[in-house]
Amino acid sequence: MPTTTGVQNDILATTLRILRDQLVDSTFKAVPLMDAVNSLGNVEKVDGGSYIDAPVILTDHSMITQLTTGYEAVSLAVKDPLRTASYSWCDAVAPVVLTRKEELSNKGERAVVRIMEARLKQTMGMFKREIEKQIVAGSSTILTDLQTLNGLDAATGWFEELAFGSQGNTVGGISKASFPTSWQNQVQNGSFAANGLKKMQQLLIDCQQFAPEGDVDLILASPISYGLYKDELQQLERYTSATEMRDMAGKLALTFNGASMYIEPNLGFTGSGGVNKMSMYFLNTRLFNIYFDQDAVFELGDMESISGYSAKSAQIALRMQVTTANLSGHGVLVNAET
């Protein structure tokens, strides 16, 4: 027969799981990149595995044969068999804890639920901050197995400040030097005050020219570069519609050639060389995929007693990774902080 404590734990865990579903949705909407990728249906939930093998688009796959008479031999020459980039999972867990003293000090099930709701929100907020820090700047000290766009400091980071065609990082086990026109990001470098809008326009053109599909639809900007862009527009600035903004958790968004631009507080960092600053990311989110293990999408476990302590906890499990099919459709604006 279940104990009273066991029943209370089950009720509490069930209540928290309902709230957890809402918080997962809020986490996606609060991170512009995750929200954009999710809206395109590029969030993949898979059955475990040790690695993620993500298909990439590097060169043309086969050759076209024109049929003039209809009797021409069809060329079956394959220029590029299916290639995959290989990524390790990022595994993480965080507990939501309630002590016996807190239970006794807050009589009534609703009081205890309120405490756990607040702690669940805190924990999910921590996950959100660490995910964003790592993806954007590679600055998380916790989720270091998660891929980062910062190639200034990480040899496996996606985006470098070097000219297109001369980059040397390794992403997903594939050397960028091996595919200089498809596995390297676009770059523009220089002061925003000098000709920032022209550099943004050129970066957009470069990304569109080399992208195998889609266009730049998301721009993440450091607070300073965002402010400089906003000042430059003056009376010409255009905001996204209320309809497009309603699900973005109140985030302010300008647009540039149809791409939504958001303030990203983790940008504006200086690379380890002490010279270059990452100011803006131009992203083609159609080329992104976010993978989750279907059993660890911020999965909330049961409330269990902690051995040796007068407390109980439920653990939130996360297993995820970020991938891209192509790098040449993305770009960075460097040193646009003045």
Predicted regions: what they are:
Residues 57-82:
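N-terminal low-complexity, intrinsically disordered segments
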Residues 2-64, 85-338:
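Core alpha/beta structural scaffold of self-assembling particle/tube/pore-forming proteins
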